[in-house]
Amino acid sequence: MEKRVAVIGAGISGLLACKNIMEKGFNPIVFEARSGIGGVWSRTIESTKLQTPKSFYQFSDFAWPPSVTETFPDDKQVMEYIKAYAIHFNILPRIRFNCKVTCIDYVLHGNEDFPSWDLWGGTGWPFSPTGRWNVTVQDARDPTAPVEVYQLDFVILCIGKYSDLPNIPDFPLNRGPEVFNGKVLHSMDYAAMANDCAADLVANKRVTIIGFQKSAVDIAAAVANRNGVDHPCTLIFRTVHWIVPDYFLALTLKSLNRFTEFMVHKPGQGFFIWLLAVLLSPLLWIFIKLGEAYLKRKQPLKKYNMVPEHGFLKQLSSCIFTVLPANFYDRVEEGSLVLKKSQSFNFCKNGLVIDSEETPIATDIVIFATGYKSDEKLKNIFKSSYFQKCITESLAPFYRECIHPQIPQLAILGFADSPAILYTTEMRSKWLAHFLAGKFKLPTIREMEDDVKKWEKCMKYYANERYKRSCISALLPIYCNDQICKDMGFNPRRKKWLLAELFAPYCPDDYKYLCWQM
C-alpha cells in the first residue's frame, strides 16, 4: 500500500523535501498557507539580497542561470531561481495553495504506549503499522469554510523560523505601544508590504528601528538612504554584533575546509581528534583575532562605540550572520542614521524613552526587528501537549538537525540555522528521502538523545550563553555532511585529490551526484 507523505510549507525547505522524496517514488501532498511558493523570499524589503555567495546558495543539481552574474543576487533573482527549480522538477502540481495547516495530531491504534518505545516509531523505520498523523487543514481564504482532515503516514514540517509569529517585547502598563501616537509594526509586516507602499510609509517620517541583526540594519540603512539628515532614522539595540562586509563573510565561508575543521572540537571525538584540535586551536585563535583586527581597522567601530564585547568565533558559533549594508557608517557619519545602545526602553506619547537618556526620542514610526518566536510556532502546530513539551522543554538539537527522538513519523526541515541555509537543508532533505525509502534505520531513541546531547555540549563550548539548538553546524558543516553521507552509505570524501580534500571549501556542487548514487 502506498505511503502517504505530507510536506507542510512551500518555501525552500518544502520544495527540497518534495523534490527529493518524489525521486524516491513517493507522491507527497504539499500544503501551503499562501498563494505562492518561496517562503520568506516572497516577502522581502526592496534592498534585500543574498548574504551568502551564490556558489554556496544553490541547489546541487540545478545551477544558477548564466544571466545571474552577481556574486550576491537580489531578492527578485532569488525568487526567479526558486520558481525555475520548482517548475524544472515538476513540484508545483504537488502543492495545494491557500491550505493552512492548523494542527497535527498523532493517532496510535492499539494498546501501544509510544513514550515507552526504545526505537523511534516503535521500529526505527519511517513508517509504523499502527501510527498515523491527522493533519487538519483550513482554507486560508475562507476561515468559515469546513476544515478537512487528512490521515498521513509521515509528515515533514517546513513551516519556517522567520515568519508568522513575531517576537515583540512586553512592556509595563502604560509604557507600551498603547500610549504612543505613532505607528508600530514588526519587520515582518514591513517586508510584506509592496515596495512603493513601504517607501511611502517611511518617507519624510522619523523612524526608529529596534534590533541589530539582518532585518534591523537593512531596514535602518534603507530608511536612512531615503530620508537623509532631515528625517534621521534611529537604530536602538541592546547588544552590538559584528556586522561584516559581504566579501568578508564570503571569505569566511570559503575558509571552512577540512583543515580548519581540524581546529574545532567535535562531539564524540576520540583522543587523536581531540589532541589535534588542542594543538591547532591557537591557529584558529590567530585567524579569528586577525579577522577582528581587520574589521576594527576598516570600520569606525571604536569611534561609534560599536566594538562587540564578544569574539567573532562566538558569534559565528551562534549563527548570527549580519552583512554590513553599503554606506552604513557613511549614513551614521552624516547624521541620517543615529545609533543608540540601550538595555531597555519604553514608549511615551510622542516617541521612545531609553534608559540612558532623559529626553524622549521623537518618533513617528517604530519598527520592531526583534526576530520571531520560532519554538513557539513549532510547538503550536501540535495538538498533543506531550509533543508540545518535547519542543519547548529541551534545548538539545534535533538528531541530524531534522528528527526529534521523541516525535515519531515526523521530520522538521529548515529549522537549522547556517550561513548557507539552502545548502544545509538540501543535505538533510537528501538524507530524509533515503530514510523514507528504507535505505537505513535510525538508532535507538536513547542513542539519538545521547548524540544530540554531545552536540549540545560541544556547541556550548564555543557559543556559551549564545548557544541555540538550531545552530550546531556553523563551525562543522563538512563534518555534519560526512555523518549524513555515512548514514546513507556514501563516501563522504567528495574531492578528487588530497590537497583539495584538505584545503578546498565544500560547496553544493560537491554533492551534485549524491542523489544518483544507490
Language model: regions and residue ranges:
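Flavin (primarily FAD) cofactor-binding/catalytic cores of flavoenzymes
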Residues: 2-47, 70-242, 246-247, 251, ...
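N-terminal glycine-rich dinucleotide-binding loop that anchors FAD/FMN and/or NAD(P) in oxidoreductases
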Residues: 45-67, 254-263
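Post-kinase regulatory C-tail/linker adjacent to protein kinase catalytic domains
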Residues: 254, 447-455
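Long alpha-helical segments found as membrane-embedded helices
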Residues: 452-460, 471-472
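A catalytic-pocket lid/entrance helix-loop region that shapes and gates access to the active site
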Residues: 242-272
